[in-house]
């Protein structure tokens, strides 16, 4: 049975019924980067240029300084940027030919934000975690060893019941979930855009997919409660958590997973294409996401299968480090990855991987060999 806290499933801020929905991104047009407001996934409004035109046409409107980067936009969203973006979206809702309106197909789509921190949830979909355990047991049985997964990992032979850890994660006495939340760091330096190539590193063959729903932090968060965590969410995006499943060739640190090697090759963190402000995502804990490889569905799940929900994971992360506007928390991957399979089919040069989160966006990646 998958447990998701029901207390906060309606915590997303309801959008004004009359508001024009929009998404946000960072784009490049002939070498010039700009922040864009995206309408209907097809048109991109240059925020700075549109704001200048709006203030010329409405001399009595408050003057709003355009943000220089997405982290600034996020930090100022509730102050002055959000109201102005809603005005710009409404003013450009109809088809128009203003010079600040671009067809998205004519632009380079960059990662929407440059976060200081990317956190990824591990084994947050129980079916995925169980698949890893079962495949580890099959592999161990075939080799005559003991199964149960890597030391300290899901299904470890010496696994004990999870206990409360004050200051880190405090469990209620009746919480039946077998583990506490689990997060690891991924370097922002390996982030690429939603349409960029994913590079298979030289000598590595076991390259896996993980299509994930990502949370964008909106306010500085440190030691926040689960109840207050929704107030620290700005919106939602996508991370394609590309993973190298090959070992490192030794038994250092007990032979357990090396997250640096597995998760941090160049291009292994595609993010975007957009960030959707939370008021336009009415049910973040009931959102379908799926992955296809060369048109074949490999993953197809829903955020309601998570073991720990968005707000629990944000609160947990804030117990360890200070989160700031624009930081990302990727919420883990559903079942269907190669690490769960007896006969894996790894990604290889020539493949096309597509990661979709409904209502948020789509990533399309050609898999290529390292030059």
Residue ranges and their predicted role:
Residues 188-191, 262, 300-308, 323-334:
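Short, basic/aromatic beta-hairpin or loop at an interaction surface
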Residues 1-9:
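Bacterial N-terminal signal peptides
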Residues 309-347:
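A conserved acidic, glycine/proline-rich C-terminal tail/linker
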